[in-house]
Amino acid sequence: MKRKTENVVPPYSPMCAPWTSPIGGSKERAGIDRSGKSHYNTEGYFVGNSAAERGLRSAREEKKMKSFDVAIDGPSGAGKSSLARRCAAELGLLYVDTGAIYRTVGLAALRRGVDRKDETAVAAILPELEIQMAYEDGEQRMYLNGEDVSREIRMPEISMCASDVSAHAAVRSFLLEMQRKLARENCVIMDGRDIGTVVLPEAKLKIYLTASPEARADRRMKELVAKGVEQPYEEVLRDIIQRDEQDMNREVAPLRQAEDAVLVDTTEIDFDESFRLLCGIIRERMEAEA
């Protein structure tokens, strides 16, 4: 399995034009490469004859022959995104950060001034949203109605906005097919809150990644400092505990460990050790499935 993935140009490879998956108001499945030209047909498939384009088609054909999907769930600040992104790059898989998608909807609700806890109000703005997820130079970026909001959705206040809107069945239904389509067409590492329990219940490997609230708050503080954002530690810890409570107790798709998920607790280990552990678990399962 490993040999095959190394010989395929991943969909997010820097040598490829950005892959995009739009949802919402526009039905046009199109992506824009660095030259500004559209290279995606109405089914969302990349077309063309360059080496990179042939690589993308090969990746799709490989997906049809052998499916391998990794579902990673866990609480806020557990390191899901950073670890999953690095593991995906190491193993030649497509990384999908579903939390970024919900953050984008949360940002839209905040900008429009709607009551984020009112499902009817939030559902009313969904048809107006066109959300695109693009891979540019190996990084996932989020676009809201054509605007790059990748940085804005990482602001601390957007975390609770995402938690609020993700509690609504209308929002989860709105985004569910997009997530499943990505997994159908690619070998993915997808992280979120309900990937192994709802989105990809048949995933080849499920992992529940967690750490203590205090450890997660420490890590979040370092991220914020690196971004030049000032926020008291006590406030960061309170937000994490509040987010946990809300995510675990919502009626729709609550955060929980799937029965067949591998539990990985990173409280006492650093990022590099966590990466080696997680990557080892995934590689072992990939080889077993080959």
Give the role of each language-model region.
Residues 80:
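Conserved lysine of the Walker
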Residues 90-154:
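N-terminal phosphate/diphosphate-binding loop that engages ATP/GTP or pyrophosphate donors
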Residues 134-136, 179-185, 196-198, 202, ...:
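Small-molecule kinase domains that catalyze NTP-dependent phosphoryl transfer to phosphate-bearing small molecules
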